[in-house]
Design a protein with these regions (language model features):
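Helix N-cap/coil-helix junction residues
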Residues: 32-33, 53, 129, 172
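Active-site neighborhood of HAD-like aspartate-dependent phosphohydrolases
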Residues: 1-51
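Electropositive phosphate-/nucleotide-binding environments in soluble metabolic enzymes
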Residues: 17, 39, 53, 57, ...
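An amphipathic alpha-helix signature
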Residues: 20-21, 72, 76
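C-terminal cap/substrate-recognition subdomain and adjoining C-terminal extension
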Residues: 3, 77-80, 84-175
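A general alpha-helix detector
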Residues: 22-23, 44, 58-62, 78
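Acidic/polar active-site rim loop that often engages polyanionic ligands
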Residues: 20-23, 59-60, 142-148
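Short, compositionally biased "basic patch" segments
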Residues: 46-72, 132-140
């Protein structure tokens, strides 16, 4: 009998906030993104998504696009600083307690999030969660993030599809 899965959603359950929003704010504060250009585009994409005129792929792609043009190694120092400065202080005590309760019960812990894997893998590690299902970033043949989503975004109905794929890779399926 495989262990019971404990699936955790990140935003406003384990984290006070949204990683994509926090990442963009962090990049604007560091001057990596031009606030005068990026903020209006961000507001427009969020409004379009809420209005139903922007789809999941375009929405996720907008945030994945913040990584475009650099390699994972080039982003690493900023990613680590982002984790310690913006994420760790916002990890909720109640969320950590819930994780620990499931861990004590022997459950298999899985973090599932629409934010990209590159940003959230450090968050999963900081929470002691060994499995992460997240939106994947495309990396070009030059080793740089292309700015595109790879595969199905882990958002809305894509979360069920991605969980099913994750389970199938482990010889399991949704009940």
């Amino acid at each position: 009998q495989p262990p019971t899965l404990a699936l955790f959603y990140l935003y406003h359950t384990l984290l006070d906030g949204d990683s994509d929003v926090l990442w963009c704010e962090y990049l604007m504060d560091r001057g990596v993104l031009d606030r005068a250009v990026f903020e209006p585009r961000n507001r427009a994409i969020e409004a379009g998504y809420k209005a139903g005129t922007v789809g999941v792929l375009e929405f996720c792609g907008f945030y994945v696009g913040t990584l475009a043009g650099r390699t994972p190694a080039q982003w690493q120092p900023l990613r680590e600083d982002f984790l310690h400065e913006r994420i760790v202080p916002r990890l909720l005590a109640a969320g950590r307690a819930c994780i620990e309760a499931h861990r004590r019960d022997g459950h298999e812990l899985v973090l599932t999030t629409a934010t990209n894997h590159f940003l959230t893998e450090l968050t999963a590690a900081a929470l002691g969660i060994g499995h992460l299902i997240a939106t994947e970033c495309d990396i070009g043949i030059d080793g740089r993030f292309s700015g595109a989503v790879a595969g199905t975004p882990n958002m809305r109905e894509g979360k069920v599809a991605r969980l099913s794929e994750w389970l199938a890779a482990r010889g399991r399926k949704l009940a």
